[in-house]
């Protein structure tokens, strides 16, 4: 790892942030605001993309911004997809303040299939899908900035996560 970090000039802070995000999963199982969730998503997913683009190679600094969006898009998609599974493990990644805005309680999230019948659930999910799509649109701008031979893997990941979101 040390050789890779040195060879590709990977910023140490990215790795520290990544580890911090993993630690969050041990100590935190709720997020109050979208800003809290964004910070978590950045640490567990965007940092991975930011490390990858250092290895892939890119043509403009703007690639970093798009790579951050790539991680947020993928992690939000995971969170939306895994609500029931996460709730079974007493983890609610969706921001509590946003859930409350739609009249959804913690016990509603933990109710399993009953959550699908909650009147606020569909509009809530639609809002979060729109958020994820906003980050997706920004993430796709990364591809032309990557070295040509490195585009295939991120393009495949983005397409796969886009199919999950649909």
Positions of PLM-derived features:
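Catalytic cores of Mg2+-dependent Asp-rich isoprenoid enzymes
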Residues: 1-75, 80, 84-166
